[in-house]
Amino acid sequence: MIDFSNFYQLIAKSPLSHWLETLPAQVAAWQREALHGKFREWERAVEFLPELTPWRLDLLHSVTAESETPLSEGHQLRVENLLKNLMPWRKGPYSLYGINIDTEWRSDWKWERVLPHLSDLTGRTILDVGCGSGYHMWRMIGAGAHLAVGIDPTQLFLCQFEAVRKLLGNDQRAHLLPLGIEQLPALEAFDTVFSMGVLYHRRSPLDHLWQLKDQLAPGGELVLETLVVEGDENTVLVPGDRYAQMRNVYFIPSAAALKMWLEKCGFIDVRIVDACVTSTDEQRRTEWMTSESLADFLDPQDQRKTVEGYPAPLRAVIIATKPETQQSLAKKAR
């Protein structure tokens, strides 16, 4: 069984220590009552993977691990087959001992768009909400973060993360918990909170923004990446049954409306730093994700529209700050 005790020990003497009042019981309940029908199969694939210590590890420019001596053909094939038991791989890519996991999304492209606008991540404690398999957490560590904590209730993502971690020498600087943000208490302890590709899946987007704010320490930075539409501060698309074949898309605001929402929730220094149309080069079917992808969700006659007739996916990145309090300012002045 995937073990979270290392994480509990890690946060016991940190600003996250009060999380231990609820977290172990939540994880234990998940292990007893909420396991996916294929979870044991996925977990066995992780267990059968060797724990490898990289001779060369690059998390700054990619997620790449290499050994001093290449794996034998048989050893590499065995590792690759175990990793393929965890398909589909959606977020990446990863290059692990000569095995290139070509994921559905080029998440490295998103990271390259976001990174120039971030405050220095050196020494920061970070929360990544809806972190998927954890690709961006490894890039956060590569950029100098002290600790990256991801939450995502999708259990396949947890097993993918644990598989990658095992092949990175059981690196303890990143951790993934199988929870949704609504299960977190107001920790107010993270220096940076990322929410990328989550907001449009929330039935109440303003509640989500408040939940993100509740996780930030005073003065902390929010990095919000989400679908948007063109328009002014009053523009919000509410799709019908589906958007780009996704059923669970509720609200897609304009970037200007989203900026106003953040300000309404009490964030300051709100700025739109990037907007980019998602291309079929960035999200596509691969050997590691063989089902439908973006090309199947766009109008074949007009790729500026989804198959339902809505504007094609446009994603914006917004950076915002949680205000300092008198108490936090006094503490920093000491």
Curated annotation (Swiss-Prot):
Per the record, the similarity remark reads:
Belongs to the class I-like SAM-binding methyltransferase superfamily. CmoB family.
Q: Where are the transmembrane segments?
A: none
What is the name of the protein in this document?
tRNA U34 carboxymethyltransferase
Q: Which UniProt keywords apply?
A: Transferase, tRNA processing
- Describe its assembly: Homotetramer.
Q: Which GO terms describe its molecular function?
A: methyltransferase activity; transferase activity, transferring alkyl or aryl (other than methyl) groups
Tell me the SUPFAM superfamilies matching this sequence. Answer: S-adenosyl-L-methionine-dependent methyltransferases
Record's catalysed reaction(s)? carboxy-S-adenosyl-L-methionine + 5-hydroxyuridine(34) in tRNA = 5-carboxymethoxyuridine(34) in tRNA + S-adenosyl-L-homocysteine + H(+)
The cross-references to InterPro entries, in alphabetical order and at most eight, read: CmoB, Mo5U34_MeTrfas-like, SAM-dependent_MTases_sf
Where, by residue number, does carboxy-S-adenosyl-L-methionine bind?
A: K91, W105, K110, G130, D152, P153, T154, I181, E182, M196, Y200, R315
Q: What is its EC number?
A: 2.5.1.-
